[in-house]
Amino acid sequence: MKYQLITLFAFLSCTTKAQTAVDLGLSVRWADCNLGAEKPEDYGGLYGWADPTGKCTDANVYDDDWNWLSDSLYGGYRNIKGICGTSLDIVRMKCGKPWRLPTHEEMNELITKCKKEKIQINGVWGLRLTGPSGKTIFLPAGGRREAVDILHQGKTGNYWTGSVGKRYKAHKDFRAWYLFFNASGYIECSDYGLRYFGYSIRPVRK
């Protein structure tokens, strides 16, 4: 059990260019850029899970094996099954309908049905995914934010879904599903993401 004073905020703007939907041949279309980015190789923002504003806030975070408790901006002490398309979904709030966070199932479909390649675009390392349609998207390795520190930028990619973690029963109330990849080629969807970490976000739509 631990008690922390965490400053929760996005380091980059929540505003984003008009998203272009890329049809990879999957169940949803994926945006060509991260939330907060202007180009595919831009990192965009690093956002806390269930923060619909992306703005700065000081929150007393009581974080242990069975709950997640913070101010109401970050979901509070509630049993949330998922936030895709809800008022806690920053994509829906910033980009409008029909854009939203991907679900765990949609993120898993992305990494299992697409060809994956480690590449650099304009000096930015990341993951290129080629779908069954032959079209591609690029996920830059934006690292993650812990409190005020940005870690492993250019080395790892961390991308939120809107799905609450279920695999770890002891942590199910304060973990969420996310995509992780690194320079060694390791790629997985994990439900071990701490919600107060700042991760990248790639919007989706039907």
What are these regions (language model features)?
Residues M1-Q19:
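Bacterial Sec-dependent N-terminal signal peptides
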